[in-house]
Amino acid sequence: MAENQYYGTGRRKSSAARVFIKPGTGNIVINKRSLEVYFGRPTARMVVNQPLELVEMTDKLDLFITVSGGGISGQAGAIRHGITRALMQFDETLRPALRAAGYVTRDARCVERKKVGLRKARKKPQFSKR
């Protein structure tokens, strides 16, 4: 690939994304597919573009992304996190704006495990008094 590319790893729920950015024309490739093909939902596409729109670099950078694990929402969040980290590596002066928007922080929320004796993580079997 290019000699002047920047890298960022993003994670969300059970998804992990590797993001490579380099100066270009705004081309986004996710797992060898375009953004529109990979994410059918407009909300997922919006989440992916959020950090680029914030720093006004939607048409100045090319992105090459590989993402695995989880579902659509988790993958979109992981890509957003990865893009944010790669942008900070690209230009450290972008950090305060990205931090203020809340994109730098890793969202630590994940699925709570199912407990023994319960139906789900917190749902208990029906209680009978008599």
From Swiss-Prot:
A single Gene Ontology CC term: cytosolic small ribosomal subunit
Keyword vocabulary terms for this entry: Ribonucleoprotein, Ribosomal protein
Source organism, top-level taxon: Bacteria
Gene Ontology biological process terms in this record: translation
Disulfide bonds: none
Gene Ontology terms for molecular function: RNA binding; structural constituent of ribosome
Translocase found in the keyword field: no
Pfam families recorded: Ribosomal_S9
InterPro entries registered for this protein in UniProt: Ribosomal_Su5_D2-typ_SF (IPR020568), Ribosomal_uS9 (IPR000754), Ribosomal_uS9_bac/plastid (IPR023035), Ribosomal_uS9_CS (IPR020574), Ribsml_uS5_D2-typ_fold_subgr (IPR014721)
Protein family: Belongs to the universal ribosomal protein uS9 family.
Name of protein: Small ribosomal subunit protein uS9
